[in-house]
Structures are given as C-alpha cells and as structure tokens.
C-alpha cells in the first residue's frame, strides 16, 4: 500500500499514530469510530527490528487499518535530517509489512502534549514517561480534525 494521502486511508476503523523520536516511538490509537485519539505506549528504540515488531504487534492487536506518522518538519516547512530519519524508518517498516501510511506535520506536537499533561495535573516524572505517546495522540487528533473537514 505504501505512503498514501490522508484522505485515501480507509474511512472506517482504528488508526494508529506514531511520534518517532531518536530514542523512542510514541504510539497512540483512535477508538473504532474515530472520535478521539489516546496515548497507547512509548516504545524504546534500542534496535530497529524489535521496535518495528512491537509497533506491528500493537497495530494488529488494535486491528488498525492505517498508520499516521508524525513528520518533524522544520519551522519553515522544509525537511531536515530528523524528517529524513522518519522517512527512513517508514521505509524500513514498509519493507516488513505493506500497510497504508500517511505523514502528518508534527511541529509543536510535543510542546502541545506537555501543555495538555500539565493542565491535567500530571507530575513532571509522569509527563517525561508519557510525553512521546501523548505527542502521538496530538498528531493523531490533528489528523482526525483534518479528516472531519474531508472534501
């Protein structure tokens, strides 16, 4: 299936969102009716193969129909080394399993996730442990908002 446009993802079913970082991959999922996105877990990215295996396990466990990947664009919208690293990760994932993947601009998602967690009263330690999964939920919720405005 490879990389597709957001509007080409299946119209129904669970979507998984990820916030790929240098040391971790934050994972979030929608509910079946795509009303909201929730943090699922943070995968430690020590080695690529086990990280991708865990991600695909979550994908299967949740019966997901598509993957939304946060793309860390530069402030001006251009692609830098971090964005290229994410594209390489997705390429590696697609070599393991052919599934529908789309990219979502993730600028400021970690800051927004931190603000949400602070407002909810999360301790600093809790925020640090869950920030990547929470950022994945922000990325996924942004994609859901875009899907609501589907032409």
Curated annotation (Swiss-Prot):
Superkingdom in the source lineage: Bacteria
GO molecular function, one term: nuclease activity
One GO CC annotation: cytosol
Keyword Magnesium set for record: no
Alphabetical list of Pfam families matching this protein: RuvX
EC number: 3.1.-.-
Matching InterPro entries: RNaseH-like_sf, YqgF, YqgF/RNaseH-like_dom, YqgF/RNaseH-like_dom_sf
Statement: the UniProt record of this protein carries the keyword Hydrolase: yes
Localisation: Cytoplasm
Signal peptide feature range: none
Keyword tags: Cytoplasm, Hydrolase, Nuclease, Ribosome biogenesis
Biological process (GO), any one: rRNA 5'-end processing
Segments traversing the membrane: none
HAMAP family linked to this entry: Nuclease_YqgF (MF_00651)
Function comment: Could be a nuclease involved in processing of the 5'-end of pre-16S rRNA.
Family membership: Belongs to the YqgF nuclease family.
Name listed for the protein in its UniProt record: Putative pre-16S rRNA nuclease
Organism: Hyphomonas neptunium (strain ATCC 15444)
């Amino acid at each position: 299936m490879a990389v597709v446009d957001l509007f080409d993802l299946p119209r129904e079913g669970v979507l998984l969102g990820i916030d790929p970082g240098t040391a971790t991959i934050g994972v979030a999922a929608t509910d079946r009716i795509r009303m909201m996105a929730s943090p699922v877990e943070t995968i430690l990215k020590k080695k690529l193969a086990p990280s991708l295996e865990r991600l695909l396990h979550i994908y299967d466990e949740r019966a997901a129909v598509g993957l939304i990947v946060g793309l860390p664009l530069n402030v001006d919208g251009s692609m830098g080394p971090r964005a290229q690293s994410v594209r390489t990760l997705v390429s590696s994932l697609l070599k393991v399993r052919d599934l529908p993947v789309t990219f979502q601009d993730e600028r400021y998602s970690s800051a927004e996730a931190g603000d949400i967690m602070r407002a909810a009263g999360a301790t600093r330690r809790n925020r640090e442990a869950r920030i990547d999964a929470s950022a994945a939920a922000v990325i996924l919720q942004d994609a859901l908002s875009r899907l609501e405005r589907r032409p």
